[in-house]
Amino acid sequence: MERRGSSCLCRCLALLALLPTLSLAQYESWRHYPEYFQEPAPEYHRPEVPSDVAKIQLRLAGQKRKHSEGRVEVYYDGQWGTVCDDDFTIHAAHVVCRELGYVEAKSWTASSSYGKGEGPIWLDNVYCTGSEATLAACSSNGWGVTDCKHTEDVGVVCSEKRIPGFKFDNSLINSIENMNIQVEDIRIRAILSAFRKRTPVTEGYVEVKEGKTWKQICDKHWTAKNSRVVCGMFGFPGEKTYNTKVYKMFAARKKQRYWPYSMDCTGTEAHISSCKLGPQVSLDPVKNVTCENGLPAVVSCVPGQVFSPDGPSRFRKAYKPEQPLVRLRGGANVGEGRVEVLKNGEWGTVCDDKWDLVSASVVCRELGFGSAKEAITGSRLGQGIGPIHLNEIECTGNEKSIIDCKFNAESQGCNHEEDAAVRCNIPAMGFQKKLRLNGGRNPYEGRVEVLVERNGSLVWGMVCGENWGIVEAMVVCRQLGLGFASNAFQETWYWHGNINANKVVMSGVKCSGTELSLAHCRHDGEDVACPEGGVRYGAGVACSETAPDLVLNAEIVQQSTYLEDRPMFMLQCAMEENCLSASAAQTNPTTGYRRLLRFSSQIHNNGQSDFRPKNGRHAWIWHDCHRHYHSMEVFTHYDLLNLNGTKVAEGHKASFCLEDTECEGDIQKSYECANFGEQGITMGCWDMYRHDIDCQWVDITDVPPGDYLFQVVINPNYEVAESDYTNNIMKCRTRYDGHRIWMYNCHIGGSFSEETEKKFEHFSGLINNQVSKR
């Protein structure tokens, strides 16, 4: 056996989530599901509220991480109050979410998880069947009858999907001061031809949807702060001035339809639904509203560098720091990932205590994206490594960088299970409409079909499957908003795609993995060459919302390294598996020996799904010497390099058996090599290749004394998808004097700033590893 089992009168805010979904042409967060391209759903007719039921308004308040969640607050009898969590159920949560215009509730939370509210606790012991038109129709102890405290305030998490055609009840709107924005949808409509032709749309009228009608907003009370919020929602970090004269000319040509109200934002809101309702343009919203001495409100947004239609963006210097101080890691899509901050030359994570939309939006804008769509907690985008630099971050929303916010530098009580992440709003680039999956068993898989221009016409066709790999598949899944790639298929004869797309129109695709679109990858252009040809060899993908993330424990490598002079007669299995250098063939089998650089490697899965071998069990290889199956021919590379990067020796470990050696906390082991067991590494577990197992070495018999780099690369050929490939390389400085070896400064690539990386060759913390004679 080779292995060792390795969260009074209150007249503020008022409710409603505004823009959970935007039209497909304006916003690119839609899943590429077939149902999104079917006929529009019929208009929703809200159930009648019985005449004897009190009229109320609801809102979601508190420390929110998404605009569609928060503490449930009820406006009744001239006051805002809360709801107690006693006897609250998912049925009551459904009623709340539907009253707010969402399709359903995803969950509900107890014990003031969004912070304690103020004012009366209006409802206690609420019982709903789930079919009620309003929370006021559910049974309860009665208005204000409760024995609860605000530590028991209930919250809900609503689905972001809106009820089609939902109309808000504005009957109480004039009786509530500081009411929040209440509209079904919002958009930026390009007016000038120059902007209509651009992608993304960066300038135009701000329009809101009421029923089936899009209406303009009067600019009489419009401010730059309003523009900042709107631009942020559409994926832009900032706003700028525009030519008012040309818009006056356009407004004079056509009669406008104005929304009866105005907006009042502070500029720090992540979502327009958090802005307050501004002064009314007309006291009688029923009549045709005019904008006296005014024009339709216009926004002109500044895109980040990645999304600029004219090359490098000209946005303010604040968005272009000379050295990035924050980065995102482990996200499937552009503008999302675990937040990592550079401090004292080392990258570290952010603890999710007090992490909310305001702080997350500061990160997003700093990186050239819009406001935050979601502040993610609980290491849902994978665990980081290294220090936790920031804790209990509290931003006002006006900061240029996350490091300008108030925070606690102490990370006591935090661990990497609490790493904070963000999902930012990004501009609609239209990439999703140029790619589709067909023939799969579910919307996450299928044959890849691309839209290309041929002879002046747009046609759909296949992608040649030759040399198609997981990196190319990752770009496809990202472009479609379907997460990570779990598989890349070079043959898709078993999937029946669109019969009108059976011709190969793209070949020679080679991606780096960072592209926003498959069209951005290198390919043959119109000179399509697919040797195998035919429908059989069209490229395909399977996508997944989660992925594993393997990271090597650098400290264990450094601590376990030593030299061993091992006799040739003890290396018969190693010879069979080609684990020795070529010169071993000339070594005397009885008296000769090989000098081996031995070490242990502990490989952790810090991702959000299990790491499974690329090949199925039918393709595993039996190794008689080790008496078990190996599931991956190439899992890691072990290399000794000159300081100029030239390889002088390499590990020749032929293949690997993957299993769970140990796991964190109460996580159960799922994989083992023995008895033809399933192989892989469970999330939260690690696989330990001990220094004393066969082939766990680099044969340095022919290496002269000197200074070297020792490098370990996990999953070097990208055979299995991971959420982050940047942490797959570990490097150590190595000094070998012919008898002893020193291994020091072992670290994972990308853990330090570029400046610090350049200094890591300085001799410090040396470990003296003597030669071990056997």
From Swiss-Prot:
Q: What is this protein called?
A: Lysyl oxidase homolog 2
What are the recorded GO MF terms, alphabetically? calcium ion binding; copper ion binding; oligosaccharide binding; protein-lysine 6-oxidase activity
- Cofactor dependency: Cu cation; lysine tyrosylquinone residue
Enzyme class (EC, first level): oxidoreductase
Task: Give the note describing cofactor binding and stoichiometry.
Answer: Contains 1 lysine tyrosylquinone.
> Whom does it interact with, and what assembly results?
Component of some chromatin repressor complex. Interacts with SNAI1. Interacts with TAF10. Interacts with HSPA5. Interacts with EFEMP2.
From the UniProt entry, list the residue stretches annotated as the region Lysyl-oxidase like. 548-751
Record function comment: Mediates the post-translational oxidative deamination of lysine residues on target proteins leading to the formation of deaminated lysine (allysine). Acts as a transcription corepressor and specifically mediates deamination of trimethylated 'Lys-4' of histone H3 (H3K4me3), a specific tag for epigenetic transcriptional activation. Shows no activity against histone H3 when it is trimethylated on 'Lys-9' (H3K9me3) or 'Lys-27' (H3K27me3) or when 'Lys-4' is monomethylated (H3K4me1) or dimethylated (H3K4me2).
Q: Which organism is it from?
A: Bos taurus (Bovine)
Entry's Gene Ontology cellular component terms: basement membrane; chromatin; collagen-containing extracellular matrix; endoplasmic reticulum; extracellular space; membrane; nucleus
Keyword flag ATP-binding: no
Query: Cellular location of this protein?
Result: Secreted, Extracellular space, Extracellular matrix, Basement membrane; Nucleus; Chromosome; Endoplasmic reticulum
Catalytic activity, EC? 1.4.3.13
Modified positions (2',4',5'-topaquinone) in chain numbering: 689
The positions making up the signal sequence are 1-25
Keyword Calcium appears in the UniProt entry: yes
